């Protein structure tokens, strides 16, 4: 249901189908509105409706192949009132023949930056500014080919721990304002959102709608 109901962002600028998926674009190169009906997103929708496995959804399929319930499965079951299939039962009504959809997302999962006051053991520099000893664990991520290795290196997070690529992107804020009348649910993660001034800016926008 995720490709038909919302988008997710990651601190490095990634725009994703959901918080678990691989990126379909980046805020540096495209807006949320462009990503919503990009060729990549429309192809994901086509594959989902044809029972195929989109490459960007591989993290969920990897879990399912091991017998573990994935985020994808949790949101397509009607046994949970919180599943997207129950929250947005009419999501596919506005789907066009070319797999495009109106830019009227009912939900978003937002990560704007990695500002945080904690260094949880399961975390990493992309999600917390407190992670300053990445070199001590990076080898474990390298062995599994984790995207974090390249992300941390390309953003220079080994030396300067803060990353926030959304704050100065005018089109991001313009797109958020466009979506305000349609939002039914917005989920925040980080970093620690309550430390982030941008989080309060979004809350102010939401409170006006």
Whereabouts are the PLM-identified features?
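Accessory C-terminal segments flanking Radical SAM cores
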Residues: 1-82
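Conserved alpha-helical substructure of the radical SAM core
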Residues: 67-209
């Amino acid at each position: 249901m995720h490709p038909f109901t919302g988008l997710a962002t990651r601190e490095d600028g990634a725009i994703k189908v959901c918080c678990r998926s691989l990126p379909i674009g980046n805020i540096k190169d495209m807006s949320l509105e462009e990503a919503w009906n990009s060729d990549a997103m429309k192809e994901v929708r086509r594959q989902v409706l044809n029972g195929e496995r989109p490459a960007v959804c591989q993290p969920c399929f990897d879990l399912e192949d091991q017998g573990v319930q994935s985020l994808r499965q949790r949101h397509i079951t009607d046994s949970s009132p919180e599943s997207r299939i129950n929250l947005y039962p009419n999501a596919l009504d506005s789907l066009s023949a070319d797999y495009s959809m109106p830019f009227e997302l009912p939900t978003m999962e937002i990560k704007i930056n990695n500002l945080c006051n904690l260094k949880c053991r399961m975390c990493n520099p992309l999600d917390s500014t407190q992670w300053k000893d990445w070199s001590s664990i990076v080898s474990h991520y390298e062995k599994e080919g984790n995207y974090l290795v390249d992300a941390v290196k390309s953003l220079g997070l080994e030396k300067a721990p803060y990353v926030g690529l959304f704050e100065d992107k005018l089109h991001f804020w313009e797109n958020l304002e466009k979506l305000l009348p349609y939002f039914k649910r917005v989920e925040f993660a980080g970093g620690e959102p309550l430390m982030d001034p941008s989080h309060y800016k979004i809350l102010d926008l939401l409170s006006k709608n």
